[in-house]
Amino acid sequence: MAVPKKRTSMSKKHIRRNYWKRKGYKAAVKAFSLGKSVSTGHSKSFFVQQTTTKTNK
């Protein structure tokens, strides 16, 4: 079984963890932005079927 020869430094661990977290953050921001544009009707690349509701008065 392969075993690392030396211990990974704390700074390298933090760099890798921050990079991993940043990828998730960017994906979340992009998803939120797409959801916002779809809900407001300003989306140009995402097609959603519009439904209308009738209210009885």
Swiss-Prot record:
Subcellular location: Plastid, Chloroplast
UniProt-listed GO biological process terms: translation
GO molecular function, one term: structural constituent of ribosome
GO cellular component terms attached to this protein's record: chloroplast; large ribosomal subunit
InterPro entries in alphabetical order: Ribosomal_bL32, Ribosomal_bL32_plant/cyanobact, Ribosomal_zn-bd
Keywords: Chloroplast, Plastid, Ribonucleoprotein, Ribosomal protein
Family to which this protein belongs: Belongs to the bacterial ribosomal protein bL32 family.
This protein's name: Large ribosomal subunit protein bL32c
Gene name per UniProt: rpl32
